[in-house]
UniProtKB/Swiss-Prot annotation:
Keyword Transcription in record: no
Lipid anchor positions (N-palmitoyl cysteine): 23
Compartments, record wording: Cell membrane
Source domain of life: Bacteria
Pfam families: DUF576
Keywords from the named record: Cell membrane, Lipoprotein, Membrane, Palmitate, Signal
Coiled coil region boundaries: none
Signal sequence range: 1-22
InterPro entries the record matches: Csa (IPR007595), Csa_sf (IPR038641)
Gene Ontology annotations for the cellular component aspect, listed alphabetically: plasma membrane
The protein's name in its UniProt record: Uncharacterized lipoprotein SAB0393
Family listed: Belongs to the staphylococcal tandem lipoprotein family.
Presence of keyword Membrane: yes
């Protein structure tokens, strides 16, 4: 089932590919372990959490490289999804992506509802256009389902309530590296007493008492890049049932 989740993510979010790239600053010394370097790479973004008012991002600049034009203030993209398998061969996935253009100070995106099938059937996907004004999500498409309409209009990104100020206290993670990409992964066992875990359990139907894993993944330069990507996942999966939350916050050029 975990392979199913991996495949579904690759197919369903290949364009968005779950980024958390953007910020960079004081980085590692030669003595830092790869685990420490990965945490430092994430920290400059996660230190911004919680972003209670997303419009604050209009006044924040992320990591800039040669991909940016001089007159481009850049664009933040924030993303959260919640995926849960309800049957052995089906995975339901809902979430939102919002692009905040610092040049125009406008925010547009969409809420998505997806269902993936493991065998002999194409995935189903429906997108509902949204925009944000005065830190409020405004639904632009007609939605007949009142429950779905409410979920969209009241949606909160993980980055709006998450807090990783104690990230440096996560230690002894399981680290893996693929030098060919390069890509870097580290996993930590979380506690059900963790405030981030409590927040997720209060917002989503998570039918397990199992303490989740925090998974951090980076493709590309550890020191920062507008080309590579990072992914943060809190995985509650058990046995043959996938349950996880994906989050990213990225900073990319707005002008091509």
């Amino acid at each position: 089932m975990n392979n199913f989740r991996q495949c579904a993510l690759c197919i369903g979010t290949s364009v968005l590919i779950l980024l958390v790239s953007g910020c960079s600053g004081v980085f590692d010394t030669p003595e830092d372990s790869k685990e420490t370097q990965i945490k430092k790479s994430f920290a400059k973004t996660l230190d911004m959490y919680p972003i209670k008012n997303l419009e604050d991002l209009y006044d924040k600049e992320g990591y800039r490289d040669g991909e940016f034009k001089k007159d481009d203030k850049g664009m933040w993209t924030i993303y959260t999804d919640f995926a849960k398998s309800n049957k052995s061969d089906e995975l339901d996935d809902e979430g939102m992506v919002l692009n905040l253009d610092r040049n125009t100070r406008t925010a547009k995106g969409y809420y998505f509802v997806k269902k993936f099938y493991e065998k002999d059937k194409f995935s189903d996907r429906k997108n509902y256009k949204v925009e944000m004004k005065n830190n409020k999500i405004i639904l632009l498409d007609k939605v007949n389902d009142p429950n779905l309409k409410e979920r969209i209009e009241n949606f909160k990104f993980f980055g709006q309530y998450a807090n990783f100020k104690d990230l440096e206290n996560y230690n002894n993670g399981d680290v893996s590296i693929n030098w060919n990409v390069p890509s870097y992964d580290v996993e930590y066992k979380m506690s059900n007493k963790d405030e981030n875990v409590k927040q997720l359990r209060s917002r989503y139907n998570i039918p397990t008492d199992k303490a989740p894993m925090l998974k951090m993944h980076i493709d590309g330069d550890l020191k920062g890049s507008s080309v590579g990507y990072k992914r943060l996942e809190i995985d509650f999966s058990k046995e043959d049932r996938d349950i996880s939350v994906i989050d990213y916050l990225s900073y990319k050029p707005a002008k091509k």
